[in-house]
Each structure stands twice: as C-alpha cells, then as structure tokens.
C-alpha cells in the first residue's frame, strides 16, 4: 500500500482550476473543503495564482481544499507549481497541522493582498473568472 499524506491547496490546484490535473495525474483524491486557522494572509500574484503566508500578526481564515496525495507524487506536484510556492505546514481551523502550499514572502512584495475575500475562488469569482467545480458552480 502506498504511503499518502493530506495536502492543503488554496489556489489553482483546487478542483476544476488550471493546475488541478497535476494532482489527479499523481493519483490524489479530493477529501473535503476546509479553512485555515486565523493566522494566514493571501495575495494575488498578478491574478495568475495566490500565495498564502502565515503571519505572526493579524491574519484570517483562508478557504482551501484537502487532498489525499501519494507521497511519491508530492515532489511532482510541487515541481509543477509556479516559482515561489512551496510546501510547508498549514494549521487548519480545528488546529490540525497538515502539509500545504505556501508562498515565499518575496513573492508577495508589491502584490495585491486579497485576504478579505476569504480565498482564491471568492476572489476569482468577484473578478468574473472561472471558479472551477466546487459543487456550487458547475
């Protein structure tokens, strides 16, 4: 049996979005929608993808999806992510800690903070873009 891990994704890896096929290609399966603890901030990187950072100051909950990913596919998923995104530890609302996609601080310099939208899908929807298949917009 393959070893697997939960991976929290908050941007274009989510269901129906541009990079979601990268998760499916490695045999990942969707688990559920969730949110982070109130210690994160979110930026739009030129409206192509988000970058989420943990903060020691004022943060908020950010919407995300949890995926069950084979460990041997995790590196492939990470390597297909845009530069400046990395995998680190993400704290969920219930204080569970899972692996998740985070942005490096330099990536957010001079970019638009979108934390107030609550997540990437909400931000994209406000802009009139496609929000993928999250069970409510198919």
Which residues make up each language-model segment?
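Glycine-aromatic micro-motifs
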Residues: 2-138
